[in-house]
Amino acid sequence: NSGGSLRLKRAVEAKAAIEEFPDCPERARGRGFDLADYVKNGTKEILEVIFGAKSGALITELTASQTMFHAVGTIMEGVDWGKNAVTSALEHPSAHDAVEYYCKKTGREFREVPANKVTGGLDPDEIMKYVDKDTVLLSIMAASNISGNIMDIKEIARRAKEINPDIYVVSDAVQHAPHAVIDVEDWDVDVCNFAPYKFFGVRGCGYAYVSDRVAVMPHIKLTCKDDNVWALGTPAPANFAAMMAVIDYVC
């Protein structure tokens, strides 16, 4: 389903039903409260059920790729230490290029770990050759739709933090989400994303988890909102309704 070929009918129906309400979830009245509940409950279920998060914040964008650029950019521009960032040759372009782009923008060295040409995966031993005490960020995908490999993100994160306890670990879980459990707490990562349309859901939305320490970094937000709020503008309750339909189906 790497191209989103499987879609849950109930997700489409849920989205269509909510889109029929021409009201705003930020209005203080009955229907507005009902729509706001979809956003509140949907955010909670995505963070807790999909990502396995006990805390942190949710980034919402039109695509998962946008969430990756948003999160990586926030870290790379918000951290004033470190001389390099690491990703791999196996990454989706949005994860790979986000690291490359912000390395150029912040004047840091861009390091790329090669894939294992025999297994098609990424070896933790090889990854650690590229990580040092000056590595700000390490971005490694959870699973590859090209080779079919599932990476041991928990082990990779653990070993990277043995080298540099302050490193930020990012994992693109877009291809992983429909096939295996995501557990950001167990993995000990700071950023993780997925695309609903590749997980039986609808197009036009992408979601990312960010850890507590990333959530409060300076980022684009309204002045009066709390430091850990990433939602910007009127939310789309229908997208949350569609994702909750997927969660109900899968879980």
Label the predicted regions:
Residues 1-251:
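Pyridoxal 5′-phosphate
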